[in-house]
């Protein structure tokens, strides 16, 4: 009997083998694309709103994937800065792009993880049998909403002096200063990390590495004389060549500390989406399967050091999947700020060569609600079939999220 138990244990697949197995009820990724990311306030999307970006993008997404829109049963779009997370205008964008009204819609706002939460929402609906096909993504126009006073939270005066409430209202840049101070992350290290992000992204743009994940879309810019001009946006506007730690070191801190415009993520505009299906449906309809969604986990952390979120969310998703850091082939950890990304990656022992291979949000930009979906569009081309990827980000008010996917 002991011998039989030993043999049974040997035949049982380990966690990695189990995740790589293909089953009819898997949640698979049929497509993942994004727009080029526009610079906030002065880039190619500066004069259009998120619903315009999303409409134009979804039109191209449907055309590129040749998906039958009537198969889409639900759409989840992440957004942070629009009122009600874009619930009305982004539903309208879906309809304007050609998705039928029979597809339901949900607006998702969990700050910087909103795009990933949209993916998780659709994936979980497929897992539970609510739907068999859904579209998840994110869209953000920081150019039109970032400085809108209506975006600021309004707190009941009876709670205005509550210590815990106050922690949730700390500006993101100050929370990064807290991380840098508490964990001794110097300005020099932050600038070195940021320079590497710029250099990797600039190299990726120059080599055309992003072309497979970007769908060129139409935008409209307003000239100084009031006339409008139609343009095509197909290249990320944040990356630039020749950035060094020394050049970044000359920038003035945004606060009383080490955070600067050079070692923090850029204010940006853009959209991204992931088409998810039940494997059996994708196979029956003949759609290509480029990946498999595995799991997403979210962890809470102290709001005043919210940037450490990935250091807690990554171990959580690894524990729940039975994987180890060594099982992961590529990591995409959002670079909200250099200090928090550095800390999180080091706490989890992420090998530098596996982290943000083509740069991150410091160089590319961070359209808040779009980032989680953008990471999927970016990481999938970096993975070889059978490899495993992990995406993660910190979340304002004290959280972190992380997800696991497999390339097929």
UniProtKB/Swiss-Prot annotation:
The keyword Lipid metabolism applies. Keywords: Acyltransferase, Fatty acid metabolism, Lipid metabolism, Peroxisome, Transferase, Transit peptide. One of its GO terms (biological process) is fatty acid beta-oxidation. Its main location: other. Its EC number is 2.3.1.16. NCBIfam families: AcCoA-C-Actrans. This is 3-ketoacyl-CoA thiolase B, peroxisomal.
